[in-house]
Amino acid sequence: MSQSTLHLGVVMDPINDIAYKKDTTLAMLWAAQERGYTLHYMEQDDLFLQAGKAYARMRPLTVHRNPEHWYDLGEATQRPLAELDVVLMRKDPPVDAEFINAVHLLGFAEREGVLVVNPTAALLQCNEKLFAQQFPQCCAPTVVASRDDVLRAFHAEHGDVIFKPLDGMGGTGIFHIGPEGRNIGAVIEQLTLRGQRQIMAQRYLPDIKDGDTRILLVDGEPVPYGLARIPSAGETRGNLAAGGRGVSRELTERDHWLIQQVQPMIREKGLMFVGLDVIGDYITEINVTSPTCVREIDDQRGTDISGMLLDAIERRLA
């Protein structure tokens, strides 16, 4: 199959609302267009199922390297997803019921031979906070619970704890409770919806002052540089969405050890684009839904991470 004949669909948040300067999906689309791919644009609610086949309202998409005008969309048509070669599922979390339904619909296209990145089974299995817990040797002490007594006992044991929801992104809903335990009851009540929802508590890692580092794996292979996301003053969240700044750095020996721990399972699940979040010596999250930070690393290091991903896609489709 020649590159020029490849039809790539993307399911994403509204393209009009993306951050032109740092959007990873846009970088992927530029790279695909430059290789001669035909681009097809979809939002999550464009997907539908009829008589056991997955369809979507698709619009032809052209992307531009122009901060004032970065895309053009053609006329919408309803077409089977099976007409596409590959679909990039780039809808940002939260992983709510609608996200899960969309992934199930993409699974019907997968069964008809469409390559979905990342694979639908892996998207359904790999909660970004919980997936990392399959590698306890790589993680800081952690508990997942909805019960007030379990969460309080964990705080009493560790003294300095981060509480966070299991389905957030960009640093939303994260609380740091110090040894004095101020507001712990209110935080647990708010995050667990009074005991109705599981949340994560993790021992606070002082290394966050140096930022957390995003490490990208493309088809199981690490990009040689990570992005340290350094919190703004007084923040405990390094996420760029929470005001952190991104500084690219080479991977450390410990980073490579962490990667080696997770690589076999990432390859086994067919995950083609994954972001590890590392604080100090520990993995805190394994992002599989819509990993970012490509633009910042490419800009600072001259890498072509989208090109690496497209090479991997072409190998799968060959």
Each language-model region and where it sits:
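Conserved N-proximal alpha/beta basic substrate-recognition cap immediately N-terminal to
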Residues: 5, 16-144
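Redox-cofactor binding/interface segments in oxidoreductases and associated redox assembly factors
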Residues: 10, 88-89, 202
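Anion (oxyanion) recognition and catalysis
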Residues: 33, 110, 155-156, 267
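Structural detector of well-ordered beta-strand residues that form the stable sheet scaffold
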Residues: 40, 116-117, 162, 200-202
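Short glycine-enriched loops at secondary-structure junctions
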Residues: 120-123, 229-231, 279-282
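Phosphate-binding site of ATP-dependent enzymes
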Residues: 149, 156-160, 167-256
